[in-house]
Amino acid sequence: MYPHVMAVTETTTPKKNRWSFQWKELYDEVITSGLCTGCAGCVISCPHDVIGYKHEPGQYKPFHLEEELGLSNCVHGEKGCTSCTRACPRFRDWETEADEHLFGRSREPDEMSGIFKDVILTRASDDFVYEIGQDGGLVSAILIWCLENNVVDGALISGLEGDINGDGESGWKAKPMVATNRDEVLAGSGSRYTYSANTMAYPEAKERGLDRLAL
């Protein structure tokens, strides 16, 4: 009789491919394809300051500042920098990986809004915030609470440009702003019907020494 022999096969988890996508892919797949939302996340995340942005009507899109490899490629990207594609919310399919990381599963076909436990209707308990806010003033109420309870130092919000028409009233053009108190949050409450790349207020926040920021 031969002794029982059991074969043991060593299994290894396949390594994930290294993320190597850079400005070149972002330019082709998002910026020039119509997917770009103008959020300016790529601009703020760039450690080399080579991505520009014009917060003006007809613009609202990032562009490359260095022309060494042409406007559709990046010297730093060719050397391995991937910050811009990692920051972009429209670059390829990231929701599946995020769902797996946060919830341990992928969303079902009927979960178009994502995975959630409950859907709750809310409003600000402060009547003044409720009245001037949009859809109940929830976001304004959260930001005010965070500022007053030392959870954050400031918030990157959307405001409106000042008296651009000379009539004593604010214009309709949205403007990225930094809010550090209740009054500044309320000054930016309500809806905006034009682009506002709130992340463009980040440099101002850093200059003011604000590290804990809400966006």
What are these regions (language model features)?
Residues 25, 31-34, 60-77:
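Aromatic/His-enriched, Gly/Pro-containing loop or helix-boundary segments
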